[in-house]
Amino acid sequence: MNLAALTAYELIKEENLTDIHAKGYLLRHKKSGAKISLISNDDENKVFYIGFRTPVEDSTGVPHIIEHTVLCGSDKFPVKDPFVELVKGSLNTFLNAMTYPDKTVYPVASCNDKDFANLMDVYLDAVFHPNIYKKEEIFKQEGWHYELEDKDAPVTINGVVYNEMKGAFSSPEGVLDRVVLNSLFPDTTYSNESGGDPEVIPELTYEQYLDFHREFYHPCNSYIYLYGNMDMDEKLEFLDKEYLSHYDKIEVDSAIQLQAPFEKPVTISKPYSIASSESLEDNAYLSYNVAIGTNLESELTLAFDVLDYALLSAPGAPLKQALIDAGIGKDIMGGFDNSTLQPIFSVVAKNANKEDEEKFVGIIEDTLKKIVKDGLNRKSLLAGINSEEFKFREADYGNFPKGLIYGLSCMDSWLYDDDEPFLYLKILDVFAALKEKIETGYFEELIQKYLLDNSHKSYVSIEPEKGLNARLEKELEEKLAAYKKDLSEEEIDKLVEDTKHLKQYQEEPS
């Protein structure tokens, strides 16, 4: 790569990423402030993504709606659904877009040079020059809109994201994941639902949605990633000429804030809906959740991956076994999730009962105290480290290109530190260090410090409620009936007309 000739960019760092047999470069585009990570190696399955840091102040789902809508046509590619066209006609090995609690990412992959260049162009034009400013119908179709078939019909709400999130909000696991995240970080972006809460989505206006895109979809708030065997100089010149050089650097306030630690654990209970024929008994979820350091501490993060295995997944895992022996829940699940700035360690009892919550917490903490005193099973720790190391070395991610998984793991650190994209691609030394620490009491000390002595935790229960969904639907119907009652004749006629117009728009060919 001829960096001297690429005058539009500044080289921030260059690293030999020996763990993945590649060379890594971190660049900054001088004019726009865009950040670019390059991983150069001989992998023909090339990967590109552009991501944006997208914190939210409410649960209207605006980043999720933008993720859907920017892929509904752009300046260069004005067809109504370029995404579907690409799925049908491209040689891609991966093509998608994902909304996370704090970021939105648009990745593509292909082994064909020409196809890869085209995919890059379509996605870049989509995020920077979408048709959303020209056609409000896109927002209505993908986000939400009122529908009125004729003036005597009831008013309803429709929209792709709105309907998708209604489904997500009705599953107990979905409710649990959301409540756990909200419970541990009440003063940050994570206290809101970035995907959208169906009760709140209809509060989002078209103008607020456009404002969010204007604010956050600027190159200086972007994370651009290129991976594989390609002419990097050519790609960087294309990025500069076609997109980045059209922007001047601005300040975007999108930093993800740390949650101040709790003085004492919080207890939260939320309902989820079951059918009237289902039993209330043995149908609750109990969850013990702790915030663990930050994602910029790679050794701590990997050590907790290992602890997750040793405590909850290994044969005879002591924490799981203690809860099963006590008859709490029919299934015990664990999880260490580092997809947020402050990772979360959780223990979940499924098919449990709310009245066992105190006992559930007591057994977890008594068992952890005993483990600290008596020591963890050394074989389980070593097996956990070996398993994580093997997965990393093999880099076999099924249908997902390994360059994509590497790229998403870059975001685990890069999103929170602009100068640190490669933290989780340099971890073989960390695995070696963890093996050395098995006999030193290091893992037991982590349990004491981060699980027992740490008050930044939450106890969450998700309880079954018969007919909850039906009740919520009835409340919505009543609310919409009241809304319609307040409309004038002219407003009702306009809503009927708008409904017809949107249906016509949706039926028009691309």
Stretches with model-predicted labels:
Residues G51-G61:
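Short pre-active-site segment immediately N-terminal to the catalytic Zn-binding motif
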Residues M1-D43:
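N- or domain-start disorder-to-order transition segments that initiate the globular core
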Residues E44-F48:
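Short, conserved catalytic-motif segment at the N-terminal edge
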Residues N2-T7, P55, T69, G73-K76, ...:
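Charge-rich, well-structured scaffold segments of protease-associated domains
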Residues K23-K30, V266-S277:
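Short acidic-hydrophobic surface loop/beta-edge motif
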Residues T60-C72:
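Active-site recognition of the HExxH zinc-binding catalytic motif
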Residues S37-I39, Y49-G51, P107:
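Short, conserved beta-strand segments within well-ordered enzyme catalytic domains
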